[in-house]
Amino acid sequence: MDFIFSSDRSHEGVIRSRIMEIETPETSRMTVTSGAWGTCVATGSQYSFGALDSESDLLMVLGDPLGERSARRDSGISDVPLEAHPGSRLHEYLVDGGMEHPSAIVRLSKSTRSIDLVTDVYLGIPIFFRVDRGVVMLASSPDLLAGILPTSFDADSAIERLSMGFISSPHTLYTEIKALPPASVIRIEADGTVRDRKWWQPPLPDESADVADLREELHASILSTLRRIDSRHPGQSGAFTLSAGLDSRFMVTMALKEQVCDFTAVNLALGSNIPARTAAHVARRAHVPLISIRRPTDFYSRLLLNGHPEIGTNACIADAHFADRALGELEGAQYLVGGFSADEMLKGSSSSGQYAAVREVAQSGEPLPRLATYPQLIDITPTIASMLDSRQTQARRSLGMSESHSSLADHVSLHRASFGHFAAATRNYAVYEPFMTRRLIELSYRIPDAVKTRVPKSYWYQPYLGGQETGRLFSTRVKAERLFRRATGIGLKQQGEWVQSEGPLWKECLVAAESARSRLSAELGHEITMKGKRRPMALTLSTAEALQRCT
């Protein structure tokens, strides 16, 4: 769903044009709601979009990927009542927490021209806002707002996006446009003054928690969600995403062993064919039917030719539209189950290690070698390192986090890419993300960072993985062979497609990795460490320069 709201009704024409520029399958399902308070244009979807217009105010409901009503008066469905400022009527509405999925509610007062926004713990639809000379604008994407009023490019955000892969909340690529924080009540006055307060705070890490108990809680939450999905679709079949990662394997094997949900595994190969090959192997072992869907190879070339920048949100939204069209053609699939965000919840945010590196650089004054990240290489200087560290601090503050909280504090920024999956314009099936529930969000904060670092991710998914947690694909091993030939001269035997941790080839990889590590450490005069015992091919960023010397 795409939507743009403006408190200035004269913007209706340009808003319509801006919405039409987004490549959606059915732009004809556009909904326009106008009044004395302004205008709102939204594309139709199974995401609920409701507008309750009265003499005193307008109440808009955004979100709920379950395809049901997102708000019901006095229904008592959710245990998280919406809060609001005194005098508002938001407290009469409750978020539909049927699957503990996110929602947001917007209230516009016609008399005071103020806006109240209530955001859930996990923003299923990202909401961005801009205030310009008394005009308040909201949208589901910063790119949508950027085309209506003049904007200036935020160079710091661009550097952060290119070097870290995301932009810290509440910043965007545009200086004037900000992202709304989760679990907050935000009031925007008619003069542009913004006030916000938190209605939920994440728990602090439980240093005394038993890891086995945390794992059992994780299993209980996921299984409970799968059973609720099954009960929502009695006698109907669905689809489970299956990629190269452990998360989707865990979801598939749990559903099979616990005999919940009738489903077909689906692999969406939007880029590399490695996930498709991994999914095919896992599906064969699990005896699950698999459908692989690949995007045309020239898609991104056409996207760039059409003027859509890769570092914005257009590519992500286009991926979502492609996935929606493809999944909509699956016969008999009434719902989709995915496994986004598990990495951040069980292993800490993917950016935490990089931020630790740039903080160290900022303190030492020594520049890092180029940071190899998509879509290009960035020179990390002490100035950039200090800027990134400052942005992380701002992001934590805007999200109400403290240094004692888990590194998941920047989860809102990190999941913009995942939420692009939810931003597609049309959908004829329900989408469920069992990892994106309030129960698991709280669990992720309770897990100490030391545990996330020490405990291998495969541990959280036992005993459901059944020996499939340590496999490596042949195509991945070809890349590893080239690396070790450069570093050690030791070639890897290419025996079979799947490598188990107990096999001789895996042990040979460990020996080769340790040999390369020792030799490069001695050559550079400082210790080089591995990312983990179960990843012998992956060396840390500090070895990039050393590996170049081995070519």
Per-region residue spans from a language model:
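Core structural elements
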Residues: 408-420
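ATP-dependent adenylate-handling active sites, centered on carboxylate activation for C-N bond formation
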Residues: 9-13, 114, 124, 190, ...
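Small-residue-rich helix-loop
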Residues: 476, 480-484
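Cysteine-centered catalytic environments shared across enzyme families
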Residues: 1-298
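Alpha-helix-centered segments that form part of catalytic cores
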Residues: 96, 173, 399, 405-406
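Charged, glycine/proline-rich intrinsically disordered loops and linkers
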Residues: 74-86, 484-503, 509-510
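Acidic, carboxylate-rich catalytic segments that either coordinate divalent cations
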Residues: 502-551
